[in-house]
């Protein structure tokens, strides 16, 4: 279904992952996030490299299930269980619908990431998720993920970032704006969505992410994918 949520000049409310967003999320993310499909493919590649037999894979902020599918399809390891978690009942419902008939080793759970226990985890993924968690809760979450990950397990985080250099930030923001225009979003839609989401999606810089990984205990962390202001990080325990 095509995303036309922000086509009208209505009173804007803060962006939320409700039924309206769940129904158009796949279209929204493909038209808003540069190289989104490549980002998903990199997750699949990382699982092949760092997944372990007889362990769990966690998809935190599972949304409509694209990451869980990447974790499950072409997985060369054996006896893995995927735990797909989202705190939006509407997203959980859509995720269950999308996963039906595609992968069967998955549990879809509605819950809060901050309350989740990670057991026997070789892979933990936050795909465009951490940016929606309150900044003052992020370090504690990454600390806990590091503690709970199996040795040689991997944390994969994909995020929108900002640049501390204002000139670079302006350049990349302009390119991202043109990306959205090229994908059919009008000026009204772009403006409305920005106003709706700006207090909900809080970005970090690359430097902040790497500092957070280091403070948690990760000694091996890299940015292994980037397109414009969207990046993926790989941190191995």
UniProtKB/Swiss-Prot annotation:
Reactions performed catalytically: prephenate + S-adenosyl-L-methionine = carboxy-S-adenosyl-L-methionine + 3-phenylpyruvate + H2O
Positions contributing to S-adenosyl-L-methionine binding: 36, 61-63, 86-87, 112-113, 127, 194
Presence of keyword S-adenosyl-L-methionine: yes
Alphabetized Gene3D superfamilies for the sequence: Vaccinia Virus protein VP39
One Gene Ontology term from the biological process aspect of the record: tRNA wobble uridine modification
EC number: 2.1.3.-
Keywords: S-adenosyl-L-methionine, Transferase
GO molecular function: carboxyl- or carbamoyltransferase activity; S-adenosyl-L-methionine binding
Alphabetized InterPro entries for the sequence: CmoA, Methyltranfer_dom, SAM-dependent_MTases_sf
Transferase found in the keyword field: yes
Family: Belongs to the class I-like SAM-binding methyltransferase superfamily. Cx-SAM synthase family.
Quaternary structure note: Homodimer.
NCBIfam families: carboxy-S-adenosyl-L-methionine synthase CmoA
Functional description taken from the UniProt entry: Catalyzes the conversion of S-adenosyl-L-methionine (SAM) to carboxy-S-adenosyl-L-methionine (Cx-SAM).
Protein name (Swiss-Prot/TrEMBL): Carboxy-S-adenosyl-L-methionine synthase
Gene: cmoA
């Amino acid at each position: 279904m095509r995303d036309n949520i922000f086509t009208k000049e209505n009173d804007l409310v803060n962006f939320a992952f409700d039924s309206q967003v769940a129904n158009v999320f796949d279209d929204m993310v493909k038209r808003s996030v540069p190289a989104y499909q490549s980002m998903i493919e990199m997750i699949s590649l990382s699982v092949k490299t760092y997944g372990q037999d007889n362990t769990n894979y966690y998809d935190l902020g599972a949304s409509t299930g694209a990451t869980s599918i990447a974790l499950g399809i072409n997985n060369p390891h054996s006896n893995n269980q995927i735990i797909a978690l989202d705190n939006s009942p509407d997203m959980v419902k859509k995720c269950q619908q999308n996963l039906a008939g595609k992968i069967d080793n998955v549990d879809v759970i509605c819950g809060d990431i901050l309350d989740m226990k990670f057991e026997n985890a070789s892979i933990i993924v936050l795909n465009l998720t951490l940016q929606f968690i309150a900044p003052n809760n992020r370090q504690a979450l990454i600390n806990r993920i590091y503690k709970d990950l199996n040795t040689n397990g991997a944390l994969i985080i994909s995020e929108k970032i900002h640049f501390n250099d204002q000139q670079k930030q302006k350049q990349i923001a302009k390119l991202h704006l043109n990306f959205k225009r090229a994908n059919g979003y009008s000026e009204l839609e772009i403006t409305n969505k920005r106003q709706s989401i700006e207090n909900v999606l809080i970005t970090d810089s690359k430097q902040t992410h790497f500092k957070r990984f280091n403070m948690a205990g990760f000694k091996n962390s890299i940015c292994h994918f980037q397109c414009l202001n969207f990046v993926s990080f790989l941190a191995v325990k």
